[in-house]
Amino acid sequence: GCGDHFFLASLQKAMADLGIAPYETAVISGIGCSSRLPYYMKTYAMQTIHGRAAAIATGAKVANPYLTIWQVSGDGDGLAIGGNHFIHCLRRNVDINIILLNNRIYGLTKGQYSPTSPRGFVSKSSPYGTVEDPFRPAELAFGARGNFFGRAVATDNQGVMELMKAGQRHKGTSVCE
């Protein structure tokens, strides 16, 4: 599964702990398992087209620099069709928080391999196993000149919440995987 409910609970708690007002916040998602998450937040929210969440989040921050921006994408949405927007957002160091839900598969399409699926991974779209090596999100982020990357396990609510709080305190783009 995608673990969205764990991230939702952690994000809500992190925002409350940080004292971030919902009316000063936007949660922006792409398409996939993460796409419905903004609807459960009492903030400004937008579900964008596939792969464009980082571009929309960047635009929202540029248009209103006082907004706290949380951009939520899965590994397929954020690193495949949205990969170019991901790396340029990091390169520009826009002050947004990217939550990357990496389950190493396109979960919503029920089994298509993603950019983070391991080599040899057998799925409906790769019945003989994938032939590519996977992206390593941390290496991709730092290679694009990102300067905040953290990783937590979805079921560790406290760890995820602390990671999100650290990402929000960081000035510039943060990636919380």
Give the role of each language-model region.
Residues G3-S10, P22, G51, A55, ...:
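Conserved active-site and cofactor/substrate-binding residues in soluble primary-metabolism enzymes
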Residues D4-F7, K13-I20, V62-P65, R91-V94, ...:
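Generic secondary-structure signature for well-ordered alpha-helical cores
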Residues G1-I49:
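Active-site diphosphate/adenylate-binding microenvironment
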Residues T25-V27, L67-I69, G172-C176:
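Generic beta-sheet signal
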Residues S29-G107, G159-E162:
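Thiamine diphosphate
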Residues G107-Y113:
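Glycine-rich, charge-decorated loop segments at or immediately adjacent to ligand/cofactor-binding or catalytic sites
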Residues Q71-S73, F148-V153, V175:
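Short catalytic-loop micro-motif centered on adjacent basic/acidic residues
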Residues Y66, S114-H170:
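Conserved thiamine diphosphate
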